[in-house]
């Protein structure tokens, strides 16, 4: 039953333009039902966002795939994720690169995600309880940064932690949000607009 649901989801993602086979295999390998509350397990492979508590959500699989594909990852990419949340996006990244650094401002979510990743034998992830606006400077610079909540503007600290040639993908805006791709080239930041999106806000500070 689960396999059929995964196959249906993968077919939908392909129809929506997701082409990276490494990425699709990672999505197939990560059991999304392990990252949602038991009450929502029957919806785990629907192409929709789901609540995970603390006012946060697990993103729609299409958006996880779209943002990940836009990062143009290689196995040696150094990756920073802002907003660990349930840990689902983190798990997808962990299947694609050697190591992932992930920051979560809500301590309870960080702890739960860390436990889920360990249960799935994904040990190539470092998680940190902290302010996503500040990134993780001591682990940078990064080849790829993915932000899974929307700041009103691109955080300066994240731009500074993006390595030359690196790519950052994030939603930007308050009421109206746009998915943007930021590339660092010759010390300049080139910003590309992708599509309109809807994410929870990237809140400053950290929460116990």
Swiss-Prot record:
GO cellular component terms attached to this protein's record: cytoplasm
InterPro entries in the cross-refs: PCMT, SAM-dependent_MTases_sf
Family per similarity comment: Belongs to the methyltransferase superfamily. L-isoaspartyl/D-aspartyl protein methyltransferase family.
Catalytic residue positions: 59
Function: Catalyzes the methyl esterification of L-isoaspartyl residues in peptides and proteins that result from spontaneous decomposition of normal L-aspartyl and L-asparaginyl residues. It plays a role in the repair and/or degradation of damaged proteins.
Pfam family, one: PCMT
Molecular functions (GO terms): protein-L-isoaspartate (D-aspartate) O-methyltransferase activity
Name the UniProt record assigns to this protein: Protein-L-isoaspartate O-methyltransferase
S-adenosyl-L-methionine found in the keyword field: yes
EC number: 2.1.1.77
Top-rank taxon: Bacteria
Keywords: Cytoplasm, Methyltransferase, S-adenosyl-L-methionine, Transferase
Catalytic activity, reaction form: [protein]-L-isoaspartate + S-adenosyl-L-methionine = [protein]-L-isoaspartate alpha-methyl ester + S-adenosyl-L-homocysteine
CDD domains according to UniProt: AdoMet_MTases
GO BP terms in the entry: methylation; protein modification process; protein repair
Subcellular location: Cytoplasm
The protein's enzyme class: transferase
């Amino acid at each position: 039953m689960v396999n059929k649901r995964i196959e249906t989801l993968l077919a939908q993602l392909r129809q929506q333009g997701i082409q990276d086979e490494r990425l699709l295999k990672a999505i197939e390998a990560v059991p999304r039902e392990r990252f949602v509350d038991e009450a929502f397990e029957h919806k785990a492979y629907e192409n929709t966002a789901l609540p995970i508590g603390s006012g946060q959500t697990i993103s729609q699989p299409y958006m996880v795939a779209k943002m990940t594909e836009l990062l143009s990852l290689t196995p040696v990419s150094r990756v920073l994720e802002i907003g660990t949340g349930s840990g689902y996006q983190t798990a997808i990244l962990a299947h694609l690169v050697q190591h992932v650094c992930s920051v979560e401002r809500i301590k309870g979510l960080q702890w739960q995600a860390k436990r889920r990743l360990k249960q799935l034998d994904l040990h190539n992830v470092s998680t940190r309880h902290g302010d996503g606006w500040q990134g993780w400077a001591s682990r940078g610079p990064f080849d790829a940064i993915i932000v899974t909540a929307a700041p009103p503007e691109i955080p300066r600290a994240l731009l500074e932690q993006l390595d030359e040639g690196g790519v950052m993908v994030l939603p930007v805006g308050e009421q109206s949000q746009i998915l943007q791709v930021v590339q660092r080239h010759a010390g300049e930041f080139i910003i590309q607009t992708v599509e309109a999106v809807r994410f929870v806000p990237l809140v400053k500070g950290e929460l116990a």
